């Protein structure tokens, strides 16, 4: 039975709260709040007893899907299990009760954590300096591109074009466009990697940078990255790495060693903070030495004196691009990432990436016979299948198979991305899934391939067992109409 809205459970006078007796003199609200800020009618808040509120949200949580329930194979999203110790440290009163406007001498523990996290991220990626300000991956992209723009302006060179590989996340060209750049697409070659000849042809004197994801969005390492780095830098351009797929690189190789000038980290992905549904995220950026002076303010600095070690916020950075967020970043995510890194250490981080690569290749080997693979078989942490075979045979599309997977108790993978793969199914199992879970997922995918051949109508009408059947998603996105008056 479909769950009612909390407003539909409301009954007049059925209130689930009580307030302590007021021991202060009664004061009229109108006497302390200007009339323009006062409501003219009571708020239409639901009146529901506590027991029904709890049951309502428990029922909703049972309908929800999350990584603590089962495998969440969204490609390029790194939906790994999030250790609960991260939440424990995040909830420590010394962190959870802070206010960002407190004097820095009263927030030394938080500043130390942020300083040390910056240092660890610098070491992990091989970058000279890090800013923790960006609130998400795309925000990190924009920050990095603004740094690149500032660099070229300081050189007296007004470059107005930015190259983006055609397999890139859509946020790459969007971030560059927001920064005022003209976007030029670079083709992928037959192996799914950057086409060096096409890159060479597009590297002109007005190109500010190349944005690249490594490994790319079909899970392939850019084996020509050193040649790409030489080509870009010889042109006077800079090299930007989208760090969405950093989960494949930890302790194995570093973007800085490949010659990248800017990289953004997705702490909510690689470094294990719960994400999805809008956040919270965290997208710090690491930069090479030539860009360090342009980082957003304030920069956290460590000071040694006769009285000991202290940390301060330095706003005196005349070349800085300024603030990128109201305060200092999404602190709760920073605490979780710090905990994750300290718990694992260098060897543990390397095992994360090794196991992520092993899991992806094992799962791919189980699915190869039933689904098309448009590019080479050896992948990093994720892979991209094509549903062309099923679509051509019986008209069963990737969307249909993704919907049918819900009936088998799994979240669907990323579909129709990257755009260079027809009927794309992008799957990232992450390192935290067991061999048995991978095999159960493969069994479901193989069963769906069988159904696509023998009972295509079933797959086309899926899902059948979910609380809500297939929605008209196009209409929902184009005619969004949420009605809830308060």
From Swiss-Prot:
GO terms for molecular function: glycine binding; glycine dehydrogenase (decarboxylating) activity; pyridoxal phosphate binding. SUPFAM superfamilies: PLP-dependent transferases. Its EC number is 1.4.4.2. Its cofactor is pyridoxal 5'-phosphate. Gene3D superfamilies: 6.20.440.10, Aspartate Aminotransferase, domain 1, Type I PLP-dependent aspartate aminotransferase-like (Major domain). GO terms for biological process: glycine decarboxylation via glycine cleavage system. GO terms for cellular component: cytosol; glycine cleavage complex. Keywords: Oxidoreductase, Pyridoxal phosphate. The modification N6-(pyridoxal phosphate)lysine is found at residue 269. It is an enzyme of class 1 (oxidoreductase). InterPro entries: Aminotrans_V_dom, GcvPB, GDC-P_C, GDC_P, PyrdxlP-dep_Trfase, PyrdxlP-dep_Trfase_major, PyrdxlP-dep_Trfase_small. It catalyses: N(6)-[(R)-lipoyl]-L-lysyl-[glycine-cleavage complex H protein] + glycine + H(+) = N(6)-[(R)-S(8)-aminomethyldihydrolipoyl]-L-lysyl-[glycine-cleavage complex H protein] + CO2. It comes from the Bacteria. The glycine cleavage system catalyzes the degradation of glycine. The P protein binds the alpha-amino group of glycine through its pyridoxal phosphate cofactor; CO(2) is released and the remaining methylamine moiety is then transferred to the lipoamide cofactor of the H protein. NCBIfam families: PRK04366.1. The glycine cleavage system is composed of four proteins: P, T, L and H. In this organism, the P 'protein' is a heterodimer of two subunits. Belongs to the GcvP family. C-terminal subunit subfamily. This is Probable glycine dehydrogenase (decarboxylating) subunit 2. The gene is gcvPB.
């Amino acid at each position: 039975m479909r769950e009612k809205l909390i407003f539909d459970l409301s009954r007049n006078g059925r209130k689930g709260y009580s307030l302590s007796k007021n021991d202060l003199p009664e004061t009229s609200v109108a006497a302390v709040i200007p009339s323009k800020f006062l409501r003219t009618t009571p708020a239409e808040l639901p009146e529901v007893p506590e027991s029904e509120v709890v049951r309502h949200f428990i029922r909703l949580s049972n309908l929800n899907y999350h990584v603590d329930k089962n495998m969440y194979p969204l490609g390029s999203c790194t939906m790994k299990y999030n250790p609960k110790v991260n939440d424990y440290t995040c909830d420590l009163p010394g962190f959870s009760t802070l206010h960002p406007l407190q004097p820095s001498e009263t927030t030394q523990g938080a500043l130390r954590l942020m300083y040390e996290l910056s240092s660890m991220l610098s070491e992990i990626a091989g970058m000279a300096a890090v800013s923790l300000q960006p609130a998400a991956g795309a925000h990190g992209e924009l920050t990095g591109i603004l740094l690149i723009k500032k660099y070229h302006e300081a050189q007296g060179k007004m470059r107005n074009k930015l190259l983006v590989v055609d397999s890139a996340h859509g946020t790459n060209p969007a971030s560059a466009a927001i920064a005022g750049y003209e976007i030029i697409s670079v083709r992928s070659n037959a192996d799914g990697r950057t086409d060096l000849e096409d890159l060479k042809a597009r590297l002109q004197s007005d190109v500010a940078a190349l944005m690249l994801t490594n490994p790319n969005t079909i899970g392939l390492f850019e084996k020509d990255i050193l040649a790409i780095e030489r080509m870009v830098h010889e042109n006077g351009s800079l090299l930007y790495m989208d760090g969405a797929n950093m989960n494949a690189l930890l302790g194995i190789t570093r973007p800085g060693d490949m010659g990248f000038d800017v990289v953004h980290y997705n702490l909510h992905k690689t470094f294990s903070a719960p994400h999805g549904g809008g956040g919270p995220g965290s997208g710090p950026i690491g930069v090479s030495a030539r860009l360090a002076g342009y980082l957003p303010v304030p920069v956290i600095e460590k000071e040694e004196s006769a009285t000991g070690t202290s940390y301060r916020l330095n706003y005196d950075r005349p070349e800085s691009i300024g603030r990128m967020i109201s305060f200092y970043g999404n602190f709760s995510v920073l605490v979780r990432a710090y905990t994750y890194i300290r718990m694992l250490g260098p060897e543990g981080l390397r095992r994360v990436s090794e196991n992520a690569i092993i899991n992806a290749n094992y799962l791919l080997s189980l699915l190869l016979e039933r689904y098309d693979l448009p590019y080479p078989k050896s992948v990093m942490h994720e892979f991209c299948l094509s549903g062309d075979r099923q679509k051509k045979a019986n008209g069963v599309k990737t969307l249909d198979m993704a919907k049918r997977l819900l009936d088998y108790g799994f979240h669907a993978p990323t579909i129709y991305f990257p755009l260079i793969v027809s009927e794309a199914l992008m799957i990232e199992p992450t390192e935290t899934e067991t061999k048995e879970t991978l095999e159960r997922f493969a069994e479901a995918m193989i069963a769906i391939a069988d159904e696509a051949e023998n009972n295509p109508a079933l797959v086309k009408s899926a899902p059948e067992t979910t609380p809500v059947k297939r929605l008209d998603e196009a209409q929902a996105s184009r005619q969004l109409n949420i009605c809830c008056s308060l």
